[in-house]
Every structure is written in structure tokens, then in C-alpha cells.
Regions:
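Cell-envelope and extracellular/periplasmic
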Residues: 9, 13-14, 23, 56-61, ...
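Short glycine-enriched, charge-decorated loop/helix-capping segments at active-site entrances
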Residues: 22-29, 96-103, 140-144, 183-185
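Active-site segments of SGNH/GDSL-like serine hydrolases
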Residues: 85-91, 114-148
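Catalytic His-Asp segment of secreted/periplasmic serine-dependent ester chemistry enzymes
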Residues: 131-213
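A short acidic, helix-capping loop that chelates divalent metal ions and anchors anionic groups
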Residues: 17-19, 64, 91-96, 134-138
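Catalytic-core regions of hydrolytic enzymes
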Residues: 58-80, 97-109
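Charged, glycine-enriched surface loops/patches
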Residues: 102-129, 150-162
Length: 213
């Protein structure tokens, strides 16, 4: 393989992980201090010099924000692999305004997002479901909305022949065993240990699909 595999990660603050504050090595793109960096480190060991990874995460973004910035952040770069993790802020909109997912056009926007990616590239599309931790306890009220978003994303991902990785139960099962503070500081964002679980799940699923093998 002579050309580098172009991989773009799209998402909200969980993907962003302060990527403009953690520039990495000289000459490398800013990847942040979250799961994107951990995935990049794993792939660098496996495929040294053969990947071009970019972090397209934006703090506070909903799926509508990703759709608005899609051409700039993703399509113009002609990626081989696109990974999407979105939904936490969409859940926040519902919980803070009383609007439903239908009223925010979540499914329509998510379908449009994946459709535009699929229309521009025949590469691999990886979708990850949102998650929330019931610590602090007030976030337990968010769980039904998070689960509804997860199922919506799962269905639409299947329509677009995308891999789908459900994260909510995966992360919460681990948190129940090892303690919530190990994985999250605020119930939404991940610690290094939490990001490691996401990175490992992403690598396992893409390995299963034979993407980097």
C-alpha cells in the first residue's frame, strides 16, 4: 500500500477531546486527548506511517452541526474511513427543552449525514451510539432518550451499510464493575480509561470487518 489510509472522526466534545490543545508530534494533525488519539496510536504501531487521521470533533455539536460542517470537515478530504459518534447533545436538547427527537428532526438529519457520506465515498463508515452515565443521578433521566437515539442510529446505519458500535451498555457495564469515577468525571465525558474502552471497541469492530487487515 503506497497511499495513506485517510480516516476522519466526526462528533461532539467526546470526539473533540480538546484536540486543539493537544497538537501531538510536530507536523502531525491535532488529535486531542481522547479515543481518537488512542486509536491513532494503535494504528501507528500496526501501520507505521500509513494512516492520515483527522479529528473532526466539535464541542457542543448536534447531528445538525455535523451536517452543516460535513463538506469542510469530511467530504472535501475524500476519506477512506469515516467514523461518527454523535447524539449526546441532541439528547440534551430534548431534555432541556421538552422537544422530542421527532421535533428536532434527529432521524432525518442523521440519515442525511450518512447519506451524504455514502454518496461521496465507497469507503468504510463506522457509527457509534451515544452514551450517558447515571452519575450524577440526574442523568438517569436521560437514559431513555439516549437509548432511543441509539436505536435510531442503529437502524439508519444498517440502511447505509455502516458498522454500528453501541457504547451505552458497554461503558455502563464496565462502570458498574470498576466504578463510575474511573470512566467519567461528569457523567458525559470520558476519562483516559473510558476513552480506552471506546478505542478498543472501535479497533475490535473494524478488525472484525477486515478494514485494516
Amino acid at each position: 500500500m503506497t497511499d495513506k489510509v485517510k480516516i476522519i472522526f466526526l462528533g461532539d466534545s467526546i470526539t473533540d477531546a480538546d484536540h486543539n490543545l493537544y497538537p501531538g508530534n510536530p507536523g502531525e494533525p491535532c488529535l486531542g486527548d481522547g479515543y481518537v488519539r488512542q486509536i491513532a496510536d494503535i494504528l501507528q504501531l500496526r501501520m507505521p506511517g500509513r494512516t492520515d487521521i483527522r479529528n473532526g470533533g466539535h464541542d457542543g455539536f448536534t447531528v445538525q452541526g455535523l451536517l452543516r460542517m460535513l463538506e469542510h470537515d469530511c467530504l472535501s478530504r475524500r476519506p477512506d474511513v469515516v467514523s461518527v459518534l454523535i447524539g449526546s447533545n441532541d439528547a440534551a436538547v430534548c431534555m432541556n427543552t421538552g422537544r422530542t427527537l421527532e421535533e428536532t428532526y434527529f432521524a432525518e438529519n442523521y440519515r442525511a449525514l450518512l447519506g451524504r457520506v455514502r454518496g461521496a465515498t465507497e469507503g468504510c463508515l463506522v457509527c457509534m451510539g451515544p452514551f450517558i452515565f447515571p452519575q450524577p443521578l440526574e442523568y438517569s433521566r436521560w437514559i431513555p432518550v439516549i437509548q432511543e437515539i441509539e436505536e435510531t442510529e442503529r437502524k439508519i446505519a444498517a440502511e447505509h451499510r455502516a458498522l454500528f458500535i453501541p457504547l451505552h451498555n458497554l461503558l455502563n457495564r464496565d462502570a458498574e464493575r470498576s466504578g463510575y469515577q474511573r470512566l467519567t468525571a461528569d457523567g458525559i465525558h470520558l476519562t483516559r480509561e473510558g476513552a480506552e474502552i471506546v478505542a478498543r471497541a472501535w479497533i475490535q469492530e473494524t478488525d472484525r470487518a477486515g478494514i485494516f487487515i
